[in-house]
């Protein structure tokens, strides 16, 4: 008699664990990208470009388009950051993107 194959439920659970691990890895990588965390904000010249830049950013999970849900101001110590909360229109993965306004150059 031959070796039994893997049960369908066990194979499905293994695949689900693998997919969750891949999602965690992509989220960890996204946190290291510019704008992925408050420690790595994207520098912009004016608040007017914050939502445009956020909407132009691709989803880290599926590459889809992000839809801006909220554009807020957060204080982190003595620094003021802009944070855009967005959701992917394709896979519905949430994402926060951090921005810092560039200091104006002296005239």
Descriptions of predicted regions:
Residues 65-66, 95:
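Cys/His-rich microdomains that often coordinate metals
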Residues 72-83:
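Short linker/helix segments within small regulatory modules
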């Amino acid at each position: 008699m031959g070796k039994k194959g893997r049960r369908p439920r066990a194979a499905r659970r293994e695949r689900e664990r693998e997919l969750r691990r891949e999602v965690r890895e992509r989220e960890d990588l996204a946190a290291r990208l510019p704008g992925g965390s408050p420690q790595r904000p994207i520098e912009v010249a004016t608040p007017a470009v914050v939502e445009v830049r956020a909407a132009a950013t691709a989803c880290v999970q599926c590459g889809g388009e992000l839809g801006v849900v909220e554009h807020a101001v957060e204080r982190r110590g003595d620094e003021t950051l802009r944070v855009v909360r967005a959701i992917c229109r394709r896979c519905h993965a949430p994402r926060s993107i951090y921005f810092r306004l560039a200091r104006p150059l002296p005239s």
